[in-house]
Structure formats: C-alpha cells, structure tokens
Amino acid sequence: MNKSTLMGVVGGLAVGILVGTFVFQSGGNQQDAVDHGEVSGVSPAQETVVNWSMPSSFPATMLIGGTGGKDFEENIRILSNGMLNIKFFDPGALLPPLEIFDAVSAGAANTGWTSSGYWAGKVPALQFFSAIPFGPGAGEYVAWMYHGGGLQMMQEIYARHNVISQPCFMTPPEGSGWFRFEVKSVDELKGLKMRFFGLGAKVMEKIGVSTQLIAGGDIFPALELGTIDATEFAMPVMDLDLGFHEVAKHYYFPGWHQPTSLGEFMVNLDDWNSLSDTHKELINTVCRANMMRTFALGDAAQFPALKEIQAKGVTLHRWSQETLDVLEGAWHEVVEEMASEDEEFAKVWASLKSFREEYKVWGDLGYLD
C-alpha cells in the first residue's frame, strides 16, 4: 500500500468513527465554531417532524456527487425514524446549481448538497474547503479539517452568511482535463477556453487559459458546441457519465488541481438552530460516515471506468514533470497574490500552510513513498 492510498484509508476511517466527539470542529462545540449569532437547539420533548428541501449541484444518477446525496437522504430518514426528512432535488428542479449558496443564505432553501468551490466569486476563502492545487491527500486533508482548525474556520466564514456547513462526501484525485488534441507543451494551452473549477482555475488563467465555471450538467453542451475548447470536471467514473469522450479524445492526469475533493452539506443557520441536538448530531454522524463511503467507492471505481474510456477511443496521458513544475510554480504565485488581497483568504492559507509544514515531518517519517 503506498503512502497516498494509506493516508486516504486512514483519513476516511478516522472521519467515519468520529461519532459524538466533534460537533463541526475538533475539540469543541458548535457555539465555539460560530462567531456570529448563537447556535441553539430544541429539546427532544419539543421535537416534531421536520421536512426540508435539498437542492443539489449534482444529478442523482452521478456516482458519489449524486448517489452520495441520495444515500445521505435515505440514511437520515431511516436513522431518525422518519422524524427528519431532507429531500434531494436534482440540479434545476428547485434551483440552478450555482444559486444554492444565495438561496440557503436567504432561507429560500433549507439546505444544499454542493461544493464550496462554486462560491469562488462570492467568498474566495471557501475554496480551501473543496480542493487545493498540489494540496494534501485525503488523510492529511481531513486531519487539517477536523484537528488543525480548518473546519472551525469554515464554520466561522459561513456563519457570516447565515449558513452552517460541513464536509459530507469526499473524492480521490480527479482527472486533469479533456482536450481535443494532444497537448505537448504548456504553450499549447495558452488561449484555450476551458471549463475549470476552484483555485485551479486561477492557476490556468496565470498560464494563459481563459476559464469558465460551468455546472456539471451544462459542460457537455458547451464542449460539443465549441463554447469551450476543453474541460475538467471530476474523476474518470463521473466524467464518463457526462460523455466528454464523445467530443474530446485526450484525457490528462494527474489532477494536480484536485488531489482530494470535499463536497458539502449546507444548512440555513436559522433552520439549523431549530433542530434538536439529536438531529444535529445525527446529521454530523451521517456526514462523517458518508465521507468514508464515498472516498472508498471513488477509489474502487476508477480502473473499470478508465478501461471503458480507453475502449471508446480515448488516449490517456500523464503530464510531464516539466509541465507539472510550471503549474505548481503558477499556483504558488496565485495563492500568495490572493492572500495579499483578501484577509480571510490569507488566514485560511496561513493555517493550512503551517499545518502542512508540520505534517510533513510525520508524513516523511511514517509513510512509504
């Protein structure tokens, strides 16, 4: 078992067994995690049936992003004996995927099943809680989130927008991009129009790519019509479902921009405060278990998907070390520039950077390369 695999398994298991120990942050309680307003709850005696809507950024048929949300819905219903019902809605059924943040913040939607990376234009710092270019593997990522202050900062930021959120699914490394032609150098990327997500989009822009943030279900039409020249979205098994192979025959790895990705379950803070403590902890526990399940499924499902993708005439490529070095250099420039412009962003980056420096001592000693 190599280092990244072992770290992923350990991280997933750690998240799955943290029952009743943490309430949205390590070593504390929700009131500590929310720096604005007071997180409260009702007693079991006051408990009534709760019916909430959960618009999703991912269709129910999509592995992990969608199926993880449906599993969450079912687990909550069963474990609450039908007292807490959170109904999953496909993208567009209630809201367009990129409007979930505003709707939950305003109370127009109770909850959302999505990714904090979609809010890059609203709150740049939230991108750290979805995926980090050249960032940590799964074990290190959840260690920072649950024990290094990451989750506490996530809660503090969201609370200022009348939202409370937590990671609720996790995926292994993604593909780096689908292209119509073989990319032989970084220079050939310049001028391309490409769908790109999160902080990685800033890196691509730094090297001359024009990026757009497009929700998953809208990517294929944009690629097919030529609105974009290339795209990235997720792991092979999820990309396969979206049909990118029909248009682009060159698929690149590794996913330097998303070595591990977190998805979130977000709740309007007023609605959250109306829940009993039992229902709050039920949600916390189901999310932690869902993190383990989705990560394990994600790792297990990739090889069969890659075989099918190749059978459809797609060539798999791995970026040269020279290209990865250029991208990593661009990332270091981007993150320092963004930190200099946004105090909230700088605070989260400082926490992550410090944690990774300390973790590296343990990682280098404890794990095989």
Question: Whereabouts are the PLM-identified features?
Answer:
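N-terminal secretory/targeting leader peptides
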Residues: 2-141, 153, 158-369
